[in-house]
Structure formats: C-alpha cells, structure tokens
Amino acid sequence: MDSARPSRIRWAAPSPFTAVSPSDPTYPKALVDYCCQEFLIRDGQVMQVYEELLSLAYWLRGFSPANVLEIGSAGATFFLLSRLATGRKAAVDIRDLRSRLQLFMFGHDWCFFHGDSHSEATQRQVRSYCDAFDLIVIDGDHRYGGVKEDFEAYREMLSSRGVIMFHDVDPDHVFKGGAGGDVWKFWQDLDEGTKTLLCCTRSSGRVTCQGESSRFGGIGIWSPR
C-alpha cells in the first residue's frame, strides 16, 4: 500500500451505525438512509440517485456477495457494499482516502489500495489480497478508454458467480461527456454477457447533484454468463 500522506478530512465522522439489526427486513433502507445524511451529501460523499441506491441495496441483500471490490471510492457507497458483503472488502482509488474511509469502516476487515487502477502494480496488489470477487464496482476513470481498461483487467478477478457493476450508465445522463464521462457509451457498446440496467427517471430528490435530482447516475450490472 502506498505510504503517501493521508487526505485532509474536511467533515465530522458519521456516528456509528446501530439503528437496525442486519436481520431486520428494513436493514438495506436503514443503511442507505445512513449513507444519505445531509452533511455527507453536501460534502460529495454520496453522488447516487437515492432511489437507485435504495434499489441496489435490496438487490445486494438478495445477491449476498462474499468478496467485494470498488474501483473509485468516496466512502458512503463502499460502506453500503461492505455492510451487505460477508467476505473481503477492498477499494482502489488514485486519491489517498484511507483516513476518510476509516471513519466508515472502523472495526471492519477491509483493505484500501492507493494507486492507479490501470497500473499492473495495483492490480497485482489487489489480486494478492483476493483473486475472486463476487462484486466489482467500476466507478473510477470515467473516460471511455479508462472504463474499458478497468473492465478488461478486473473481469479476470471475478468469482464463478461474480458480476461487475458500472455507475453513470444512464443513456440520458445530464452530465455525460462532462463529469459523467463516457461510461454510458461503454455500457451501450458492451455486447457480451448479460446486462441489467437500473435507472431512475423521476426521483424524490432526496439526493441532488449540482441541482439535479435524477438522470445523474444509472447503474448497470454485467454478468459474463
């Protein structure tokens, strides 16, 4: 792991999550609501359409992944994935977010890799930690070539039941070509395996991004089978 100085923390730590037992049917929603606290949204820790994140949480509850990997991590989403996973949890980011993520992940077994997800060195480190992930989230480099590179490299680390999740695949993404990048285009061009699209066209506005309450996300789930 890179020894660079930790990122400066600009916000207070969220209080520990103890609201609902994991056995409670409302556990996924409680996790999402915890992630969508106003100060986390304001600081950019949550950039997901609320209804998409909520639907994803219930899907994850049913899928019940063991090992999970997130490429491009802000904190809140990684916390959600990790709480609904039963095995190893890993995150990769070109920014050093260890101090920030530690506030969400305190007391949990997890690993953060500070480096370029495209580099062979980073990929070797991830593989040495775990070489079979049930869920890999690609939400880092949003350029077409960057998304493709992450997809080609990390698909080799999928377990026999593993899937890859992409964020920002909404074909009508309000920021596509800009902050939303070209993920939607890569998703559109991906013509192998099976694809499931989760896209909210009308939202309650619980989470907003630059004044938008919907069409700034879109979740795509890809399976090689």
Model-predicted regions and their roles:
Residues M1-V137, D141-R225:
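A short alpha-helical cap/connector motif
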